[in-house]
């Protein structure tokens, strides 16, 4: 493996490739390897474009807000400053916080306002993220003025996110901190950034239901209730049945216990806490560097081809758009040898961003205390920049945090969607289906009809009289449908619309600000 990495990213190989590329360019010959990328990163890279929702907020792709109940909060500027910065910060629970700051305020000033608003004690794991003019994500530097870092604005839009994923969630002392970690991981899984095997996704979803809804009561709760939640991008009916079955096994867990179990399960995911960055090798093909608590992973497409442990990386430099790593490895005789690896990035700014992220990860997870000396430069962070890690390390956050006797916070409810059975019944009626297609909201629900009975268009108010109509489904699945062996499920007296009104009432009650809802045949077409 090490030979392959030296052959691909070695300094001499990069020099030979550069000379060959220059010769081909002078001769007017192109190389397809210099063109578009081959393959993609194993996960969403940090330089990728975040999907933006109206208002500047970033939500999971194809989804929307994960929770409901987030309201708009305004924090006025302190003092008598006339010139102010207007910043909008989107929290993990969907709340939008607008903050007025002095003109020359630094990133630390804004971060302090946010954590004070949240009443957050374990602040070292979190940060504020923003998009630059090239749609590349960056972390707000606490030591620099906001205006010098953010060129898009005012108003300056940022997102409060988990920056360092704890390698051991049991070290998180505050229940509120663990709750924020769960929200971040739910965002990562729902957006597709964090890949999750089927069985693990089922367990995590069941723990979410246990934390939010409590005990699974069979007369009241059904797999149809599970379909009102979104846990993964491609959620199926069979998966919802498995989630419901697993949910029943977690009886007795409190919300705090369920969230801790969620984190202890999620920490074993292969891409948990991996900060991905796209780079190029000497062949011009795309690779991905993943920053982790243990070291730097190297991916070719979805395949992991190497790992550099932090103790083995002795130097890391950057110059313009080239990043250089010096790694110490043992040869066949047990002697240490230095190997130099060179990576290329699209621009000097992107290269510096990767270098800064690597320095911060190394300092946070590997050091006990950050270096406070400004004159002496360590071998690891040498050349090219005056940047120094100024925060606290994970060791300091774990051993030096003060504990509060009591702390209270509100868990926001998840956004609810029309249940699968209701969506299926409505979509099966050709009259109502045509009405839905004419709406301005093209995505009333994310489910496709599971059966298509022969209903004449002249029957505008067709609705089934029994839930057993699903037995006529032509969709064959390996797992039985949850309607087959549930004879105790009864249709409500008010029909299926009554359940949908309940979903709407739940979302309406959870909304904190103004909203607009459009009805057609008692069906909410705008959530």
UniProtKB/Swiss-Prot annotation:
Classification via InterPro entries: Band_41_domain, EHM2_FERM_F1, Ez/rad/moesin-like, FA, FERM/acyl-CoA-bd_prot_sf, FERM_2, FERM_central, FERM_CS
Cellular location(s): Cytoplasm; Cell junction, Tight junction
State whether keyword Nucleotide-binding applies. no
**Principal subcellular localization:** cytoplasm
Q: How is it modified after translation?
A: May be negatively regulated by phosphorylation.
Q: Which GO terms describe its biological process?
A: actomyosin structure organization; positive regulation of cell adhesion; positive regulation of gene expression; positive regulation of keratinocyte migration; wound healing
Query: What does the entry list under GO cellular component?
Result: apical part of cell; bicellular tight junction; cytoplasm; cytoskeleton
Domain FERM positions:
85-369
Record GO terms (molecular function): cytoskeletal protein binding
User: Bias category Basic residues: which stretches?
Assistant: 413-424
Which spans does this entry mark as compositional bias, Polar residues? 467-481
* Annotated region described as Disordered, given as residue ranges: 23-47, 400-425, 455-493
CDD domains (UniProt xref)? FERM_B-lobe (cd14473), FERM_C_NBL4_NBL5 (cd13186), FERM_F1_EPB41L4B (cd17204)
Q: Name one Pfam family in it.
A: FA
Task: Kindly indicate whether the keyword Chloroplast belongs to this entry.
Answer: no
Describe its partners and assembly state: Interacts (via FERM domain) with ARHGEF18 (via C-terminus); the interaction activates ARHGEF18.
Primary role: Up-regulates the activity of the Rho guanine nucleotide exchange factor ARHGEF18. Involved in the regulation of the circumferential actomyosin belt in epithelial cells. Promotes cellular adhesion, migration and motility in vitro and may play a role in wound healing. May have a role in mediating cytoskeletal changes associated with steroid-induced cell differentiation.
Q: Which PANTHER family match?
A: 4.1 G PROTEIN (PTHR23280), BAND 4.1-LIKE PROTEIN 4B (PTHR23280:SF18)
What name has this protein been given in UniProt?
A: Band 4.1-like protein 4B
């Amino acid at each position: 493996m090490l030979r392959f990495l030296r052959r691909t990213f070695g300094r001499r190989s990069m020099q030979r490739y550069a000379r060959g590329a220059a010769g081909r360019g002078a001769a007017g010959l192109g190389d397809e390897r210099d063109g578009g990328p081959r393959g993609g990163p194993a996960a969403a890279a940090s330089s990728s474009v975040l999907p933006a929702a109206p208002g500047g907020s970033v939500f999971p792709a194809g989804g929307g807000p994960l929770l409901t109940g987030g309201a708009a909060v305004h924090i006025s500027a302190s003092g008598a400053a006339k010139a102010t910065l207007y910043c909008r910060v989107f929290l993990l629970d969907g709340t939008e916080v607008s903050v007025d700051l002095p003109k020359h305020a630094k990133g630390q000033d804004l971060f302090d306002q946010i954590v004070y608003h949240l009443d957050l004690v374990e602040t070292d794991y979190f940060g504020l993220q923003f998009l630059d003019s090239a749609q590349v994500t960056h972390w707000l530097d606490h030591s620099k003025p906001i205006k010098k870092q953010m060129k898009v604005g005012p108003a300056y839009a940022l997102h409060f996110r988990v920056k360092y994923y704890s390698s051991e969630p049991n070290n998180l002392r505050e229940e509120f901190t663990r709750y924020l970690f769960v929200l971040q991981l739910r965002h990562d899984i729902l957006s597709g950034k964090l890949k999750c095997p089927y069985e693990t996704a089922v367990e995590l979803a069941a723990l979410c239901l246990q934390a939010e809804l409590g005990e699974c009561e069979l007369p009241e709760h059904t797999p149809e209730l599970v379909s009102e939640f979104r846990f993964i991008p491609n959620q199926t009916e069979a998966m919802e049945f498995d989630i419901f079955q697993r949910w029943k096994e977690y009886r007795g867990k409190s919300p705090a216990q369920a969230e801790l179990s969620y984190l202890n399960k999620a920490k074993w995911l292969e891409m948990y806490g991996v900060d991905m960055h796209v780079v190029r090798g000497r062949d011009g093909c795309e690779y991905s560097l993943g920053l982790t608590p243990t070291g730097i992973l190297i991916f070719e497409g979805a395949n992991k081809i190497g790992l550099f442990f932090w103790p083995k990386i002795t130097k890391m430099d950057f110059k313009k758009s080239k990043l250089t790593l010096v790694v110490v490895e043992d040869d066949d005789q047990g002697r240490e040898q230095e190997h130099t690896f060179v990576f290329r990035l699209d621009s000097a700014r992107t290269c510096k961003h990767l270098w800064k992220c690597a320095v911060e990860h190394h300092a946070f997870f590997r050091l006990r205390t950050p270096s406070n000396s400004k004159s002496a430069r360590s071998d690891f962070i040498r050349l090219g920049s005056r940047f120094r890690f100024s925060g606290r390390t994970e060791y300091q956050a774990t051993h030096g945090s003060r504990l509060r006797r009591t702390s209270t916070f509100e868990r926001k409810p998840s956004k609810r969607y029309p249940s699968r059975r209701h969506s299926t019944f409505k979509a099966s009626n050709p009259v109502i289906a045509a009405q839905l297609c004419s709406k301005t909201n093209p995505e009333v629900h994310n489910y496709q009809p599971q059966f298509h009975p022969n209903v004449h268009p002249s029957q505008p108010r067709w609705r089934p009289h029994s839930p057993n109509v699903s037995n006529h489904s032509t969709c064959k699945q390996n797992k039985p449908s949850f309607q087959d062996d549930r004879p105790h499920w009864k249709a409500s007296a008010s029909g299926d619309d009554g359940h949908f009104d309940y979903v709407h009432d739940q979302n309406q009650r959870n909304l904190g600000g103004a909203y607009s809802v459009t009805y057609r045949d008692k069906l909410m077409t705008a959530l």
